């Protein structure tokens, strides 16, 4: 597509003709998509390589992501490996953020996507969860689409029934104190509710550790929580689609 547009522009320069209508329309559409605010939903899923299949799984997953590129999937796909965890070390969290309900309802070529998944990924992996979350801007600092930093802190919070509103109100009251990118999402479908996840992208593990005092939630929500897990993630630069990782910093 890029080379075709270059030829069109070159032809206009040479002959002095007006820009073709299709070029103007495509340019306007691209600009509109770039300026459009992110949608409110994220799809977050998790899988792990079967025992003894790590090499085959990684190669197959990378081939599957290449299928998404060839299919011109417009979604931005993130992949993180779980680094610090008591239960999920080396598992992969893959996700897309800033989506609308209409976009999630119309993924690229779903039949072909599933076929390629069955060939390249499923023989070597176990899928362990797939959920849709809603971004909560009143609790967060950021726009719901995480900066693709090389590290991230990932917190999962499960609440007792009927306490979601009180939990959100308590976090919203502390929102102005947030110092760095902090993204909260509420599970909509895909598991036991109420469940929330917090994602804090950071440039390094040192940054996460240096900000550990900010990790704690307000004391007033302690009685609402049935389980809370804090893990750290590594962004996988070779497992991204339409995402450019932030450069490493010394």
Predicted regions span which residues?
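Short S/T/G/P-rich N-terminal loop/turn motif that feeds into the first structured element of a domain
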Residues: 25-250
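C-terminal segment of classical bacterial N-terminal signal peptides
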Residues: 16-26
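Bacterial N-terminal signal peptides that target proteins for export
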Residues: 2-13
